[in-house]
Amino acid sequence: MKFELFREVALTRDFPEHQLRAGDVATLVDFVPHPSGGENGCVLEISNAVGKTIAVITAPLSAIEPLGPNEILTVRSLAPTANVPA
């Protein structure tokens, strides 16, 4: 599947180290080639409900999917951590 930069995508798996869950929405900001020919990756920016960036992560391309026209966004709480700016 071909993804476009700066489009919103959904995570297909959890990233517990960042308190992110499958279904969370992220913005695709860059592509990252695998250094030894494995699965390529991407850089994702995750924002809170008011648009403030709370994380920037790298993930394999298989960990994202495009948003679909039959999907709606939901809101969930993110427990505060030392990595999340107030």
Question: Residue locations for each model-derived region?
Answer:
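Basic/aromatic-rich interaction segments and small domains that mediate binding to polyanionic partners
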Residues: 3-67, 72-75, 79-80, 86
